[in-house]
Amino acid sequence: MKKVGVLSLQGDFAAHGAALERAGAQPVFVREREQLNQIEGLILPGGESTTMLKLLRYEDLFDDVAEFGRTKPVFGTCAGAILMAKGVTNPAQESFGLVDIEVERNAYGRQTDSRIAQVRPFPDFENRTAPGELKAVFIRAPIIRRIEDGVRVLASYQGDPVLIEQGRFLVATFHPELTDDARVHSLFLSKL
């Protein structure tokens, strides 16, 4: 069984653990650098990206997670997507810069503007998982404003990319872990 880490300093890491189990993987809740040696891939969960950055620095994990991402698969959702982006606006903030995208934080509005939407994935996603719409939970979600060459869009919502991949990296601006559909997590497992 594949072991996948979920950064567990803040955010919805428990929901990702359950989604990984549904997809057939063993979650490892990463709180210490030594745990990075036990896993094949890492999920950066949703939560609050500035708080996660502070905790990564406080726990002295920022450089270790950045190093992990240089050679291993990483999947970021919502705040995790922000942490993976090369560029961050509204306001600008530090990130790992793993994926050639620029994101705008909280672009869908305030907490009260959060929503659940049906998203039709592109054939490239469906051909590698299963057909059908994705239930996308957007909670103060970022918008991907710019993508560079080499980034593949797997699903969009209202014309904006919401699920992308670049090589071993997967990014969702929504929360696939908050639904019973394990296809996005299964796609990440295929990268391990």
UniProtKB/Swiss-Prot annotation:
Keywords: Glutamine amidotransferase, Hydrolase, Lyase, Pyridoxal phosphate. Transmembrane segments: none annotated. The keyword Hydrolase applies. Catalyzes the hydrolysis of glutamine to glutamate and ammonia as part of the biosynthesis of pyridoxal 5'-phosphate. The resulting ammonia molecule is channeled to the active site of PdxS. It catalyses: aldehydo-D-ribose 5-phosphate + D-glyceraldehyde 3-phosphate + L-glutamine = pyridoxal 5'-phosphate + L-glutamate + phosphate + 3 H2O + H(+); L-glutamine + H2O = L-glutamate + NH4(+). The active site is at C78 (nucleophile), H175 (charge relay system), E177 (charge relay system). GO terms for biological process: glutamine catabolic process; pyridoxal phosphate biosynthetic process; pyridoxine metabolic process. Its EC number is 4.3.3.6, 3.5.1.2. PANTHER family: PYRIDOXAL 5'-PHOSPHATE SYNTHASE SUBUNIT SNO, PYRIDOXAL 5'-PHOSPHATE SYNTHASE SUBUNIT SNO1-RELATED. This is Pyridoxal 5'-phosphate synthase subunit PdxT. Belongs to the glutaminase PdxT/SNO family.
